[in-house]
UniProtKB/Swiss-Prot annotation:
This is Temporin-1LTa. The keyword GTP-binding does not apply. One of its GO terms (biological process) is defense response to bacterium. Belongs to the frog skin active peptide (FSAP) family. Temporin subfamily. It comes from Rana latastei. The modification Leucine amide is found at L14. Its main location: secreted. GO terms for cellular component: extracellular region.
Amino acid sequence: LGALTQLLLNLGKL
């Protein structure tokens, strides 16, 4: 667990 959270954070940063 972690990759999904990172992906979500990246999407939010966009």
